[in-house]
Amino acid sequence: FKRLRSDKKKEDLAMSAAPADEGDDVAITHPERVVFAKKKLSKGDVADYYRQMARWILPEISERPLSLLRCPDGVGKACFFQKHHGQGLGDAVHAVPLQQKSGREDYVYIDDERGLLQLVQMNTLELHPWGATVADPEHPDRLVFDLDPGEGVSWADVKRGARDVRDRLQETGLQSFVRLSGGKGVHVVVPL
């Protein structure tokens, strides 16, 4: 508060509404359905998580072709990977035609929180971005080392492995950062 305005009558003033988040209009059906049984987390919990994390997640996945892990009945039941665009994903989930050996195929990408939440609505639990953008899919702008531990590999070993990859990259003049992979491992990411 700075001061009262003397140049306007109170009847002429109106409170401005706070801007709505991009994904606020995305309806999450069956928000009570449990998708992570061990943790008792529901589809609604997953949507809330992605809403809260969108500003950090989107810079990593936006405008990049995506491979999606979709689990309609939750983790531990039938899940499948999807990379091609299809009907019903939502109007903020876009298609980019990319050349493959078999011809051109439409791949999935998003560019905002609304698209992210539409993917959650379609039971997407993991999003795996390409190392290239939809604008230039033939020229990667990042390299990813996926450290996915096998049976019996400790978290301490994973961390040691990530540091080793980082150190070797630094020796060649490449800087990297680590992000969690969504599973048990980590990604060491190198911007190119």
Language model features with spans:
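Short, well-ordered alpha-helical packing segments
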Residues: 47, 54, 58, 159-162, ...
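Active-site loop/lid in soluble adenylation, ligation, and acyl-transfer enzymes
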Residues: 26-137, 141
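Intrinsically disordered, low-complexity regulatory tails
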Residues: 1-24
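Long, charged low-complexity interaction segments
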Residues: 18-26, 31, 168, 174
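Signature for HUH/AEP ssDNA processing cores
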Residues: 108-181, 192
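Short, conserved secondary-structure transition motifs
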Residues: 76-77, 189-192
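A short glycine-rich, hydrophobically flanked beta-strand micro-motif that places a catalytic Asp/Glu
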Residues: 66-71, 174-184
